[in-house]
Amino acid sequence: MKDFTTYLSTAPVVAFAWITITAGLLIEINRFFPDPLVFSF
């Protein structure tokens, strides 16, 4: 188990998880607010 946690903390795995979370967040924001350029405050 120690080797597995060491693998999960390596830079490519952490970068992949970070990019995946960021992409998912952007996709969901764009799903609920499709075009923020048309918001008139």
From Swiss-Prot:
Location(s) in or outside the cell: Plastid, Chloroplast thylakoid membrane
Keyword terms: Chloroplast, Membrane, Photosynthesis, Photosystem I, Plastid, Thylakoid, Transmembrane, Transmembrane helix
Membrane topology: Single-pass membrane protein
InterPro entries for this protein: PSI_PsaJ, PSI_PsaJ_sf
Keyword hit for Plastid: yes
Record SUPFAM superfamilies: Subunit IX of photosystem I reaction centre, PsaJ
Keyword check for Chloroplast: yes
Main location: plastid
Database matches in Pfam families: PSI_PsaJ
A single cellular component GO annotation: chloroplast thylakoid membrane
Transmembrane segments: 7-27
Gene Ontology biological process terms, A to Z: photosynthesis
Job description of the protein: May help in the organization of the PsaE and PsaF subunits.
Family named by the database record: Belongs to the PsaJ family.
Name of the protein: Photosystem I reaction center subunit IX
